[in-house]
Every structure is written in C-alpha cells, then in structure tokens.
Design a protein with these regions (language model features):
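Short catalytic/ligand-binding loop motif for oxyanion handling, primarily in non-cytosolic enzymes
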Residues: 86-90, 177-179, 219-223, 279-282, ...
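Short, flexible loop/turn elements at secondary-structure junctions
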Residues: 32-34, 58-60, 70-72, 83, ...
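Hydrophobic faces of well-ordered beta-strands that scaffold small-molecule active sites
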Residues: 167-169, 211, 271-273, 348, ...
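Glycine-rich phosphate/pyrophosphate-binding loop
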Residues: 106-181, 187, 415-502, 597-608
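Substrate-binding/active-site clefts of carbohydrate-active enzymes
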Residues: 136, 172-345, 352-378, 420-421, ...
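Conserved alpha/beta catalytic core and glycan-binding cleft of carbohydrate-active enzymes
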Residues: 344, 359, 365-529, 533-534, ...
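Carbohydrate-interacting/catalytic domains
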Residues: 1-169, 174, 503-508, 512, ...
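Conserved, mostly hydrophobic/aromatic
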Residues: 30, 79, 171, 203, ...
Length: 691
C-alpha cells in the first residue's frame, strides 16, 4: 500500500482496464508487457497542478493496477511509465512524458505542441536514438474519470434497420451544423447541434435511415496544420478510442453525444461511427510520445521485423496499430463495445479496414479481429462496414471481407462515374447496378454487402464531380499536390461555376443521373451530405484540413436548382423505400433480370464490350399482390450526348407507364400500350412501371 499526501492506493484488480469508478473509489489498470513500473499522476480540477503521484502497486498478467479509495468521478489523471529507452529494439519508454490512458473515457484540454512531447532531442543529429528529459505534462491533455451511471439506456431500443432497407448519409458533426441558422448558435458545430430538431427533422425528411458520422473519437490538430492556420477537420488521426472529441462538445459536454443518439433513435434513424483503429496520432519514429508509444511501443505498434526502430506503415500515416497482439485487439473490442453499449451507437465504418485483418503473414478474413467480432453477441448484431483497403502488400480487399460485413465498393464508384462520362464500361456497369454479385455472391453474403457510393468525404462532392476536370486544393497549403488526381470527373465545358445555361443544364441532369443510379442500384446506397442539393467545395477534393466554409454545408440562399434537386432526391428515396424490386434482399429472392438493347432485343455478348445505351427489365413475380407495389419495372440508360430511339418491349401484360425521367423533356405519366420506339434523351435515365 502506497500513500501520497491525502491519497491512498491499494492493490485493486486487473480484469477491467481503464479508470473505473465503483461508487467508493476508482480502480486504475493499464496494459504494458515491457514496462518496469508505472506511476499514476493525479491533478487538480484545472489540470495544471499535480496533486499526487502514486506508483501502481500490482502487476498481474501484464496489467499494472491499483485502487484509489474515495476518489470521485471528475478526477483528472495521466501516467508516467518507466522502462528501457531502446528504439533499436522497439522500446521508447520515457517517464518524463505524461501519457494519455488508452482507455480514458474523457479528455480535458488540447495538446499544446511543444518540444517536450518528443521522447528524443529534436535538434540532435541522432534524432530518436537520443533521450529527452523535458516534462510534457504542462502541454498534455489530462484524462478524466467518468461516472458510468450517467450512461442510462434502460428501456431504450435501437432502430435496427434491416440492411436491405438502409440508406446511409455520410456527414460531419461540425460541417453539417455550423452554418445552419435553424440551430441555436451556441450549439452549432456540436453533438447537441447534430441532435437538434432541425438536424434530425431534415435528415428524416429525406428518408435517410442511418447517419454515418466522420470520426468522433478524440483527436489532436497536427502541428504542421496549425503552423499553416489549418486544422484536422476530418479527424482521421485518433488518440482516444474511448473518448469523444471534445471539440464537438456543447454546454452538456459528453451528455450531448448521448442526447444526439437518443434524438436520432426517437426519429427511427441509426447512428454509425467512422472509426480509426488502424493508426494513431503518434506518427513514425520521429513522432511525439503521447500515449501508446510511451506505454508499450513494441506491443501496440507493428515494427519492421529486422529493424524494430522503424514502423510498418501500411496506413500511410507513419505507424500501424498491432491488432494481432491480444491485448491490443482487446482494446479495440472493448472500445467498440463501449460505444455500442454505453453510447448506444448502431454500427461502425472501419477506416482502412484491411489493417484490422492483418496477421503477421498478411490479410486474413478469418483473422483474430474478424473472429472476435463475429462471435461477439453485441457487435455481431450491429452494422459493420469496412473500407476494404490499405497501402500495404495485398491491401486491396474489395469483396474479401467475411460474411456479415458491408464494404465500401469503390469499383461501384469508379464504374458509375466512367459510365456517365460515356466510357466503355457497360458490362461492369450492369454488374454494379445489380449489387456486384461478382464480388459478394459468396459464402452466403447478401447484395447489401456492397455499400454503393458516388461520392464520399474523400474526393469531389457530386456538384464538383460534374463541374471540375481537375482538383483545386490550393487552400490546403500543399501546392495542390495533395488529393486524388484520378477523379473520373467532367466539367462539360467550363472549369467551376459558369453562367452558361447549357453547361449548367447538363450538370444538373448528370447529378440526377448519378443519384438515380445510386438509389436504384441493388446494394446499400450511401449519400454524401449536401449532394442532395448540390453542395460544392469549390473543386477541393481533399478537405481534411478545411475547418472552414469550404467543408461546411451551406443552408441559406440556395438557388432553385438546389431545391429542385433535393425534392428529386427525396422522390428517389421514397421510391426505393416503397418498391422491393429496387432493393434486393437476397441473390435468391426470385428476382428476374432481362437486359435488352436499344432495338428492344436481348443484349448480345458483343454489345457488352461496347459503350452503349442499355435497358433492363426487373421483375419480382414472387411478390404478393399489394396496392402500389410494382412487380415489373423497366430502366433505360443513355450515357451519351445525343438522344437514341429505344424500342420498348411489351413483355407481360398491361403496357408501361413512365414513372420517372432524369431529362427535362420527357412526359411524366406517359403510357405505352404497344411496342414502339421511345426517344431516350441524351444523358438520361427513364423508369417505366406497370400501370
């Protein structure tokens, strides 16, 4: 038993990691397989003054632990960890650095970047092989003990939207709310603003079922961005896997996040979090020591097998989290369960998800992480979405995730963009339209496994996709060298905004084509926030550092074309939601598909290799007769500039009624009762149904 001033520390227990309040005191437990001792540092409410330093008295199963009686929620703390400073063997212990608890449920303060954050002498020629003795505590956030009783979800139920009914809306807490005048100014840019009635009602009015939020785990602003007057806007640089990003706090603090989830659930909308477990904000061997690196670098990160000083960089960020280590895997699983059970979210999208399936020999869809999730009684019921790639060997794994997972399908994105540019991808386009069975009709996976998208946070918005040939990222301060160059975009005659009515008309029609393709494709559609009314980032396709009006959604003074596009999008979503044949549930659900060419005959094998107009008849004869439910639909696609006479076949009985067109010149409600040539406008889609 060790005492320090007014504090006493007892043995405590090792089975629950983090700082856990039991009503009488707080148990502290932290994993480190290679540390020699660990000190718990307690701070006054300001976080500026250390009031006690207590050595954790016990070491059990590689867990350092101790119990502080009478300590209450709200207490601030950090760790100092002692051990070898031996970078060449993968160890970077430095007790001069105050470290953030990997299990901290809340952090107080921001990182005030200082040379003291680095475990080595920055100006020394030997760099990270040197040792720095400056104290980083004055410049480092403090961890806060929370009261678990505040997370009360009794008598609450999740919306539990079936995958086949889901429509995902990707957005950003601050970006979505900062400029919305319908939200009270004090809570704009916060969780409370995201959960405000104005936000929830708008998303509900579109017909969205599931909101996917860009990262909300705690993350810092990188020094190099601050030096340029920029910030880490997207948040893909996590450090606290259990702690919400305090930059999104409103007056209610952490409770604002829970209230946001409740508000969406009350509206029948799911909340999905974009999570970043593949790397941390500590960078490579020359990065700062903030948490994992100083606690047990060799365990938490994957190092080069023959040079442990250096990190495997399959993420492109400098380090890679070592989820093949059982304790690191446990941390990720504990984090997921915390957000699922204590914060009550409904699913996760895993950034660079291939990393999580990497074992020492490479990616394995039966690897430890996937097995752990599959058998977990809580997580296996949630929506799990992988970004199925990283930059390491064999990192591209689209179609390679295990059953139960959805995947961002970039083949869908690229093919659809190419098709509407007029490229020769008809065969691939057909496969993407019908759920990418070539990728997902395996091991009992369903069409919903393909998360289809045209745009996402990373890349052009929909408006910019049809307005710019090239990226314009000058505001990022990297001489326009950042961001993707291969955008498969087209400006149709002018770069950026123009007064040319003809060009603007084409752009609006192409937006309708993209949205119609997305929402009538089998699979799970994901819409980028603001695309429904033509939000622009002025050609910036990499807004990761733009916490500014470049990335924020603009709500006021929208042109009539924006309002018209929004209403068109609502109509598309309503059609998808009400018509089962537009949202396939299974590869074996009785759906009948007939592809035909502009002459009305069956699409021939040689025609699949040509860029061409195409038609498809989708039938569900297995559906029970019900008023308003379609059993048959015709979709016609023309990606080319000129109109095409398209022979409408008369399969079945009753003829056809024109339900929807993306062109301005076709007649809504037009009825066809006999085989005839229909003038399919250039760059358009037409949907027919039975009367």
């Amino acid at each position: 038993m060790t005492t320090n001033r007014a504090f006493e520390i007892r043995s405590g227990y090792s089975h629950t990691l983090g700082a856990n309040y039991d009503g009488e005191g707080v148990n502290f437990a932290i994993f480190s397989a290679h540390a020699e001792r660990v000190e718990l540092c307690l701070y006054d409410p300001s976080g500026e003054h250390e009031i006690a330093r207590l050595e954790l008295p016990e070491y059990t199963d590689e867990i350092w632990h101790g119990y502080v009686p009478k300590l209450q929620p709200g207490a601030l703390y950090g760790y100092r960890v002692y051990g070898p400073y031996d970078p060449e063997n993968g160890h970077r212990f430095n007790p001069n650095k105050l470290l953030i608890d990997p299990y901290a449920r809340e952090l107080v303060g921001d990182i005030q970047w200082n040379d003291a954050h680095f475990a080595y002498q920055l100006l020394h020629d030997d760099k990270d092989l040197t040792f720095d003795d400056q104290d980083s505590a004055p410049f480092t956030p403090k961890c806060r003990v929370i009261d678990p009783a505040e997370a009360n979800w009794e008598d609450r139920q999740r919306p539990s939207i079936p995958w086949s009914n889901a429509i995902i809306y990707e957005t950003h807490v601050k970006g979505f709310t900062q400029l919305n005048s319908a939200i009270p100014e004090p809570i704009r840019g916060t969780f409370e603003g995201m959960g405000h009635k104005a936000s929830v009602d708008y998303i509900k009015s579109l017909g969205i079922t599931s909101v996917e939020l860009l990262p909300v785990h705690w993350f810092p602003d990188d020094q190099h961005l601050l030096d340029k007057g920029l910030k880490n806007f997207w948040g893909y640089n996590s450090l606290g896997f259990f702690a919400p990003a305090t930059r999104y706090y409103g007056p209610k603090g952490i409770q604002g996040f829970r209230d946001m989830v409740r508000a969406f659930h009350d509206a029948g909308i799911e909340v999905i979090l974009d999570v970043v477990y593949n790397h941390t904000a500590e960078g490579n061997e020359l990065g700062p020591t903030l948490s994992f690196k100083g606690i047990d670098n060799f365990s938490y990160y994957r190092t080069m097998p023959d040079q442990h000083r250096y990190y495997i960089n399959d993420t492109g960020t400098g380090n890679t989290v070592n989820t093949s280590h059982p304790r690191v895997l446990q941390m990720v699983m504990d984090s997921l369960r915390y957000w699922a059970e204590s914060m009550y979210v409904d699913g996760f999208r895993f950034d660079l998800g291939t990393i999580l399936g990497r074992e020492p020999e490479g990616f394995d869809q039966r690897g430890g992480f996937f097995d752990a999730v599959t058998q977990d009684p809580v997580l296996a019921k949630l929506k799990l979405i992988g970004e199925p790639w990283d930059i390491g060997p064999g990192g591209y794994q689209v179609g390679g995730f295990p059953p139960g997972w959805g995947e961002w399908n970039d083949k869908y994105r690229d093919t659809v963009r190419e098709y509407w540019k007029g490229d020769n991808v008809t065969n691939d386009f057909a496969a993407r339209l019908l759920g990418s069975g070539d990728l997902y009709d395996l091991r009992g996976r369903r069409p919903w496994s393909s998360v289809n998208f045209i745009t996402a946070h990373d890349g052009f918005t929909l408006n910019d996709l049809v307005s710019y040939n090239d990226k314009h990222n000058e505001a990022n301060g990297e001489d326009n060298n950042d961001g993707h160059n291969d955008n498969r975009s087209c400006n149709y005659g002018a770069e950026g905004p123009t007064d040319d009515e003809g060009i603007n008309a084409i752009r609006e029609q192409q937006k309708r084509n993209f949205l119609t393709t997305l929402l009538f494709s089998h699979g799970t559609p994901m819409l980028l926030a603001g695309d429904e009314f033509g939000r622009s980032q002025m050609g910036n396709n990499n807004g990761y550092c733009q916490d500014s009006e470049i990335s924020w959604v603009h709500w006021d003074n929208l042109p009539e074309t924006a309002n018209a596009l929004r209403e068109f999008t609502r109509h598309l979503i309503q059609l998808r939601a009400t018509q089962p044949l537009l949202r396939r549930e299974s590869w074996r659900d009785g759906l009948e598909i007939r592809w035909f060419n502009a002459g009305g005959g069956a699409q021939q094998s040689e025609q699949w290799d040509e860029g061409s107009t195409i038609g498809v008849c989708i039938s569900r004869p297995d559906l029970q007769p019900e008023a308003g439910i379609w059993h048959d639909a015709l979709l016609l696609f023309n990606p080319f500039e000129g109109s095409v006479p398209f022979r409408i076949p008369m399969w079945g009985e009753g003829g056809w009624v024109l339900e929807l067109t993306t062109a301005d010149n076709a007649q809504q409600g037009m009825r066809i009762t006999e085989e005839m040539d229909f003038d399919l406008a250039g760059r358009s889609i037409v949907l027919f149904r039975r009367p």
